[in-house]
């Protein structure tokens, strides 16, 4: 067991919803404060697709996510060190979270073989064999200089059952200890543990019991959002938040749909990330409080309203739906404008959620959000109805 460390993260709970498990917190990191609940946009190779660091800053983003697997391959840790870490490389003066590279074990499974030592990859760039160990993952993340680093965990698809899930859970605990020992900057870089256990409540409980014994500054709920039934998903989320310490951040990995964000805040989660808002923008889909608009469709060719008249993002302040629709015929700028809007939508949604918690009206916020998103009670997803019921919100 590692000795207690001096962490670079100071966490405060500012308000808790008296009905649900929702909470508004603030934690201070080396590159400034982060107010939660928070959505973190994802930049795979040190940049948001179609958005500059300045634009992200202007949207009020306090923390974004970089991918260790891709950045470790190209441009690589040596170049990162010379650039002054990932902050210097992408000219980003705010906070960064880097993942461990473990998720690619699922998404690039044909490239990988898992042993106790680590994950054997064939590089998609040059075909070379690479062994990503817990130590190597932390070495790369130390070179990147991220404010929050994730442990390397043994990731299996959330739809898999049986002995492989138990093996992955126990291995993730052992790998956490190796990651803690390998972190050369604990006073500047915060290492988060990742709770595994698949959809097996007993395994997840065991993992929670073991990992919460470790002196780490925060915890992530991993191994979900991979195609499992939503009914299983929310039950594993609530089981996890029930057993995680109150005084540390709780990060639900890979969640980005608006309804999922609101429900999982009610279940006690603080931090979220997902490629969804940027990926869906590339297909012409703009996020709005009542769902999404497919701006490529010809119905928008003569629609001179902004995407959302209540949105204060640069896209909605300057351009019409018709203009963006026209851009799709000849220009990639359409995707850029929608990406800006979609990131702003996610950040604004989480600010509204937070304000409602601070003002003691979160349950009413949830009622209003669901009514706007789905127009009628019979369209509410049953999993969301059931999940909210368990934390004291009966949807009207």
Curated annotation (Swiss-Prot):
Highest taxon, organism lineage: Eukaryota
Any GO molecular function: protein homodimerization activity
GO BP annotations, alphabetical order: tRNA-guanine transglycosylation
Catalytic activity: guanosine(34) in tRNA + queuine = queuosine(34) in tRNA + guanine
One CC-aspect GO term: mitochondrial outer membrane
Active-site residues from the entry: 99, 273
Key words, A-Z: Cytoplasm, Glycosyltransferase, Membrane, Metal-binding, Mitochondrion, Mitochondrion outer membrane, Transferase, tRNA processing, Zinc
Localization (cell): Cytoplasm; Mitochondrion outer membrane
Keyword field contains tRNA processing: yes
InterPro entries with a match to the protein in the record: TGT, TGT-like_sf, tRNA_ribo_trans-like
Chief place of localization: cytoplasm
EC number: 2.4.2.64
Top EC category: transferase
Coiled-coil spans in chain: none
Binding site for Zn(2+): 311, 313, 316, 341
Quaternary structure annotation from Swiss-Prot or TrEMBL: Heterodimer of a catalytic subunit qtrt1 and an accessory subunit qtrt2.
Family: Belongs to the queuine tRNA-ribosyltransferase family.
Designated name of the protein: Queuine tRNA-ribosyltransferase catalytic subunit 1
Species, as recorded: Xenopus tropicalis
Native organism taxonomy: Eukaryota, Metazoa, Chordata, Craniata, Vertebrata
